[in-house]
Amino acid sequence: MANVVDPRDIILSPVISEKSYGLIEDNVYTFIVHPDSNKTQIKIAIEKIFKVKVDSVNTANRPGKRKRTRTGYGQRKATKRAIVTLAAGSKPIDLFGAPA
């Protein structure tokens, strides 16, 4: 991902779960990101897309689950998640229509 022009190629989608929705109150947001992206690229992409100040970025590589099919076993796609903490004075991101 050395020569990515569009930051929307790095940030693929927000993670919609009970845990990620609860972390919004603490200015912590979770996104599914491109597997080859690094923390610096993720930080720059979030700041450009949402026009906020990012404090820190943590990443986690999640392996795909092994699932049974009719003919044997298959594998779900592996994902990379980024847990982004916004700076203290930054405005909240309105992803899910959460109360600010």
Swiss-Prot record:
One of its GO terms (molecular function) is rRNA binding. Keywords: Ribonucleoprotein, Ribosomal protein, RNA-binding, rRNA-binding. InterPro entries: Nucleotide-bd_a/b_plait_sf, Ribosomal_uL23-like, Ribosomal_uL23/eL15/eS24_sf, Ribosomal_uL23_CS. GO terms for biological process: translation. GO terms for cellular component: ribonucleoprotein complex; ribosome. One of the early assembly proteins it binds 23S rRNA. One of the proteins that surrounds the polypeptide exit tunnel on the outside of the ribosome. Forms the main docking site for trigger factor binding to the ribosome. Belongs to the universal ribosomal protein uL23 family. Part of the 50S ribosomal subunit. Contacts protein L29, and trigger factor when it is bound to the ribosome. This is Large ribosomal subunit protein uL23. It comes from Mycolicibacterium gilvum (strain PYR-GCK) (Mycobacterium gilvum (strain PYR-GCK)). The gene is rplW.
